[in-house]
């Protein structure tokens, strides 16, 4: 998979930008606050129809404008497909081959991306919500059914919480509608839990050999999906549904008192264990970074297995956060097989040695130029 071109209109600090990319490594060099991260964010948004930096689409629109458009062309095998996203006060519109998509779940997955940024080093020790979002965004790209189910789960959860709040405030005493919402939550939530368990097992299988190699065979990585519902490890879908329903029934009084749903996939977590120790609690900074690196590299292989093509990789100012050894493992792993976009103030000696014939852009105050050996492009 390859992103051959990108066009931005009124996107953050870019009023009008068109770029053509190398199928190999594309490097964007510049000082901080010049627009490098905005550029990589736009590629991420083009793929997933949402930003990793803000929950408000309005933040993506240039402050002088009322709407923004991101468009690009992706190449799979020998065919090219145009993609575009339009954001305005009326919402977002997604198009594939110039045809508007009725659901975003039909759009997401056309372009698959893996983002590795400094905040991803928080994947191991950050809040559980960081790890849930990681699972949802990465697995959602690979599996449209999972993306649909997690979207439905969030909608039902929002409705159920709103009704629990009404019960808490004694605005209603009728629990029949709560029963309906509970049944819906259990049905979709069990699908989400089962799918997440499968994803975590496959991610572990891909990450373990990478982690062992980066740690020079000194450490073994294990991933544990921690659910807020106490069911047997190898429970099937119907068993998960039954346990989820029983747990919600036991928690109903507490839920009404709190006005919110206290158990379910929205409360689950992912634990990283190295040599039988929780890396978030007992791991050194080096172990935490090795774990995060192994997970990101495993994602690339897993997505290639699932979709039949390698995703594109976005490295946003992350090389400077890795020591020479981890930089080497990362760059060798992606060498000549993954289209990569790198932002950095400057390239390290390791990167210059290992990156073959990169296409280098310089970014300054929202203006982008190619290095002298290329034709200038803005």
From Swiss-Prot:
One MF term in GO for this entry?
Answer: ATP binding
Report residues binding ATP.
Answer: 30-37
Q: What superkingdom does the record give?
A: Bacteria
UniProt keyword annotation of DNA-binding present: yes
Instruction: Write down the CDD domains for this protein, in alphabetical order.
Output: ABC_RecF (cd03242)
Where is it localised?
Answer: Cytoplasm
Function summary: The RecF protein is involved in DNA metabolism; it is required for DNA replication and normal SOS inducibility. RecF binds preferentially to single-stranded, linear DNA. It also seems to bind ATP.
Q: Which PANTHER family match?
A: DNA REPLICATION AND REPAIR PROTEIN RECF
Q: What is this protein called?
A: DNA replication and repair protein RecF
Traced from the root, the source organism's taxonomic lineage reads: Bacteria, Bacillati, Bacillota, Bacilli, Lactobacillales
